[in-house]
Amino acid sequence: MEELNIKQILFLAIFLVIGVVLFQPIISYVNNVTTSGTYTTIISGTLTQTSFVSNPNYVGSSNAPLVSLVPLFYLIVLIVVPAVVAYKIYKD
């Protein structure tokens, strides 16, 4: 019984560490694929030129709202799984 709790606590710690470490790269990637592009301004003397540079990784306007929810669901899983494991440990 004690060894089972140690395994569960170890799983919980590893899960949280990996989850927290991967959270920022996931947010960065989602921001990358949901941004259609950027505006670039070039100033040469008195001439100002603005151009739009499209993002080749853009998922499209219809998919962007769904993809932008990925970090939210990831955060929910990161909260719910440890809560369930902690409840099972507490219950035993």
Curated annotation (Swiss-Prot):
The chain crosses the membrane at residues 8-28, 65-85. Keywords: Capsid protein, Membrane, Transmembrane, Transmembrane helix, Virion. Pfam families: VP1_VP3. GO terms for cellular component: membrane; viral capsid; virion membrane. InterPro entries: VP1_VP3 (IPR009379). Its main location: virion. It comes from the Viruses. The keyword Transmembrane applies. GO terms for molecular function: structural molecule activity. It is a multi-pass membrane protein. It is found in: Virion membrane. Belongs to the fuselloviridae capsid protein VP1/VP3 family. This is Structural protein VP3. It comes from Sulfolobus virus-like particle SSV2. The gene is VP3.
